Amino acid sequence: MKVGVLALQGSVSEHRLSMERLNVDVVDVREPSDMNGLKGLIMPGGESTTLRKLLVNSGLWDTISGSDIPIMATCAGAILMGKSDETTFEKMDYRIDRNYYGRQKDSFEKNIRIGNNQKFRGIFIRAPAIVSVGDGTEAIAWDGEMVVGCTMDRHMALTFHPELNDDLIFHQMWIEGL
């Protein structure tokens, strides 16, 4: 199986390493032709406005918009997957609030709840929050009552950075769904 990591900004190398640790072939995606033959695409965090511009300029916006490739999106990537006041892919049925947790200086780490009350150390960097989920969207991670991770079809959106944690549970869950 081969997946791609959108290599325009964000924690590209960390996501690559997570996939390699799971013995998954991984390639960097910088232009539309890089998506040929992929079973899935990881869309890392970064800054969502910049990411959107880079996607448009590279031709990847239209390619991803017209594709049904499963996507794992983190932080800014999650902003582009849901519904927002900004232009997004709207591939998942949830509303997201950009910079919900505040500015860069307000970034933090804390235990979040996943699945059957299992704990995961979430790393939130200028993080958004999923403020509502629609039909067909399943919440999979929570900060208190706030949804910070969800799935829909074969897509996964996380408002934190699982790639900065040694626990590969979210990468593993996504790969198992491909």
PLM-predicted stretches and their roles:
Residues 1-2, 117-120, 150-156:
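Beta-strand-turn-beta hairpins that frame and shape the catalytic cleft
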Residues 1-56, 63, 168-178:
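N-terminal beta1-alpha1 cap of cysteine-dependent amidohydrolase-like domains
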Residues 10, 129-178:
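C-terminal and late-domain segments of enzyme folds
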Residues 25-27, 121, 138, 156:
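Conserved beta-strand segments of alpha/beta enzyme cores
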Residues 42-43, 73, 158:
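Redox-cofactor binding/interface segments in oxidoreductases and associated redox assembly factors
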Residues 47-112:
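Cysteine-nucleophile active-site neighborhood
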Residues 85-146:
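Pocket-forming structural segment of enzyme catalytic cores
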